[in-house]
């Protein structure tokens, strides 16, 4: 047994180490000169408290820090945060060599996906074969499949109109977006739109992982432990996280099948996987035909890519649709304007025009942009690291390697940019919208998809889904909100994407009938 005096000595040394670390971080660190709470400067336990104990509250605590300390604050021992909408382009658009913050890239237990890649050159390599697949032209070629899914959603809503059941909007939109992105990734659909109550979707699994991500950020070893844990135990203890492991295994199996198909037809550039039931090229068929090195085409990496792509392609689109529908159903004046425009543009409600035609409808497009603005996209901060040069903000010189972050929510709800920023006002996007105080284009501050080389690659697909779905909903059906109010869409928690109050039952409505001609 270890001598008690040795234990005491070790305890004293540990305490002295902690004291020395605190003194260094407060007074001698390169970040010591930057304003912010002393507790935050001392330890990451400050962030742990707000995000893990209080459940997704650090984003809002950072906002309170800015109210007290100004536009630049030190939010933990190693990182700075800036709240100044005019600096967004400087941090995310103008400097292509800026990297992601490695510590935050591993918060889901892997950093091999394109979006989580730290180094800018490797990110560019991984993104290059994806860019053509998400171009406007490629998404237009894929659009018939989106029309097909919109039509299936319409049929399901007609069933709800007939039987009078209450519709939970986010579940329906998760199923819709899940079927769309799985069709584009693999060439087949999971058929979530056909499930009872739209309950067979990815939402529960991704939500569980997102809510766990704050803990995983502070203790990344937990993902290793989960990965090594018996699946039967996970199913019993954390059933929704277990669902993610099931999905992960399923995706890797599908990727493996696609790889085998391509290895069997190495010379056929037009070959597609046996999983692909559609005529269009799929994302993973194209990735395997790309010039990426073999190390980038492994089952494990492409499986992680698929997992991330589905999450990004489902959660944000579904929430944007849910938010937009809620505000339209809550504001009869806006809804009446939209219906009038849709009736004039779509004489036959059973025959939707192309998304290109719909995007030319000014009020529909304004509703889409305003709904996306209020839904925010991602709510978590987005750190960047300048590997070689200092970042200059105002009179502050930030040393290289120091992570600097901003938050889309701060820009999209900035009262200096958006009048009445918390209100749904589609009219703000009509004509040539300007910032009232400066005359700048309002579009400059529309950042839910990010900007620059790391902006959301799925922006074109999201716009097609939004325009087609909203046009179908409000040209064909009438709705009535059911036991739902603004608290069911107000952002109260940051779990990577916005989360309303934890007690919410979702945005619910009854499909009351068809639009009267």
Swiss-Prot record:
GO molecular function, one term: heme binding
EC number: 1.-.-.-
NAD keyword on record: no
Keywords from the UniProt entry: Antibiotic biosynthesis, Glycoprotein, Heme, Iron, Membrane, Metal-binding, Monooxygenase, Oxidoreductase, Transmembrane, Transmembrane helix
Membrane protein topology class: Multi-pass membrane protein
Glycosylation sites (chain numbering): 111
InterPro entries in the record: Cyt_P450, Cyt_P450_CS, Cyt_P450_E_grp-I, Cyt_P450_sf, Cytochrome_P450_monoxygenase
GO biological process: antibiotic biosynthetic process
GO CC annotations, alphabetized: membrane
Similarity annotation: Belongs to the cytochrome P450 family.
Protein name, per record: Cytochrome P450 monooxygenase sdnE
Organism: Sordaria araneosa (Pleurage araneosa)
